[in-house]
Amino acid sequence: VCETAAGLVHTNTSLGIVPAGTGNDFIKTIGTPRQWKEALDFILTHPARPVNTGEVNDRFFMNVCGGGFDVLTLTYALEAKKHVKGIWPYLYGVLRAIRTFKPFRMHIQVGDDLTMDKDCMICSIANGRYIGGGIPIASMADVEDGLLDVLVVDAVPRWKIPFYLPSLMSGTLYKKK
């Protein structure tokens, strides 16, 4: 979807998205039904609407662009999904990420006004609300507001990471101090 949408940026061409992936996070954000028949009916009966796109390093994205603990967890979970099903791959991913994650240095610049250099645990630039099959990384994001939501979580000691997980899963990580 992302590659197709990138080709449509700055055009008036509409794109209808039928869910066929594993997470379907952007579908959830825009309110399209998750079953393909209902999604097709929805696309054919609802008017097209413009949505924001983001651009990082000359690549467009529609949902969320990010890095850090959350992405490492999902990488490990996808690896484990080849062998086990259900919630187990995600639990494995979290536990392995807690054990191996190292904070990363980020240089963030927004226009000429805001520059940050810091060690981070998570950095997400969000147009959509969800990642990883429904985790509300940016619960306040709106794909039609003309803005991208930026979530930066400072690096914390490894032993504190589990205390951040409930906020991540509930969509309130942006409130965490």
Predicted regions and their residues:
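Catalytic core of DAGKc-family lipid kinases
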Residues: 2, 6-14, 18-121
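Gly/Ser/Thr-rich active-site loops/lids in small-molecule metabolic enzymes
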Residues: 81-89, 133, 139-159
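Short acidic/glycine-rich loop or secondary-structure boundary segments that cap or lie
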Residues: 70-73, 116-118, 131-134, 158-161
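ATP/nucleoside-binding phosphotransfer catalytic cores, i.e., glycine-rich phosphate-binding loops
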Residues: 110-112, 117, 142, 152-177
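Glycine-rich phosphate/pyrophosphate-binding beta-alpha loops
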Residues: 66, 70, 124-138
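Short, conserved beta-strand edge motifs with alternating hydrophobic and charged residues
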Residues: 107, 124-126, 149-153
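Short, solvent-exposed amphipathic alpha-helical segments in soluble enzyme
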Residues: 9-10, 78-79, 139-142, 166-170
